[in-house]
Curated annotation (Swiss-Prot):
Protein name (database record): Uncharacterized HTH-type transcriptional regulator Rv0196
Gene Ontology molecular-function annotations: DNA binding
Domain HTH tetR-type: 2-62
Regions annotated as coiled coil: none
Length: 194
């Protein structure tokens, strides 16, 4: 069972994926997590910024674990598409990727300085996902330079499809990206890896 601190981090990640970081207040996290009111600054002396950073790290680790568990690039693509497909359907298209939600807010002049550590964490998560994905593609026999290009392409395209699916309240963008990335990977894989 998770303690109050862990529940707060998970709750923050869940709220960010639906509302974004700016609209996720500590009071909302406390209510969502069921943590005691005075616990926020006890567990997060760095305040809301620390909580948001840890929520980004948590969400990043969740997807990184999926990437590491995948047998290969095609299985990884299928697993990620399925994860976001189920997430979008189960939340009536309210929940996207919390890392993307934080990143979209990077240009906000009002909070740029305060949000800088959170944005830096989000950038590091995207880089890590791309690196781990490239390693999957390399293990499948795709040359390293091409594997890194495909990993950035896959990450970027998937994030865009999630955003479009949310806005349109329709899975078509996700399905299209799934089909096209799958075809691209199949064309790139050596015969023995297909």
């Amino acid at each position: 069972m998770q303690g109050p601190r862990e529940r707060m981090v998970v709750s923050a990640a869940l709220l960010i994926r639906e509302r974004g970081a700016h609209a996720t207040a500590i009071s909302d996290v406390l209510q969502h997590s069921g943590a005691p009111r005075g616990s926020a600054y006890h567990y997060f002396p760095g305040g809301r910024t620390q909580l948001l950073c840890e929520a980004v790290d948590y969400a990043g680790e969740h997807v990184a674990a999926m990437i590491n568990e995948a047998e290969g690039g095609l299985e990884l693509l299928d697993a990620l598409i399925d994860k976001y497909r189920q997430q979008l359907l189960s939340t009536d298209f309210r929940a996207g990727c919390p890392i993307a939600a934080v990143s979209v807010e990077a240009g906000d002049e009002q909070d740029r300085e305060r949000m800088a550590p959170v944005i830096a964490r989000a950038a590091a998560v995207f880089d890590r996902w791309s690196d781990l994905t490239a390693q999957r593609f390399i293990a499948d026999g795709i040359p390293p330079d091409r594997a890194h290009e495909l990993a950035v392409l896959a990450t970027s395209t998937l994030e865009g499809a999630i955003l479009l699916a949310r806005v349109r309240r329709d899975l078509t963008p996700l399905d299209l990206v799934h089909r096209q990335l799958r075809n691209l990977l199949l064309a790139e894989l050596p015969e023995r890896s297909r």
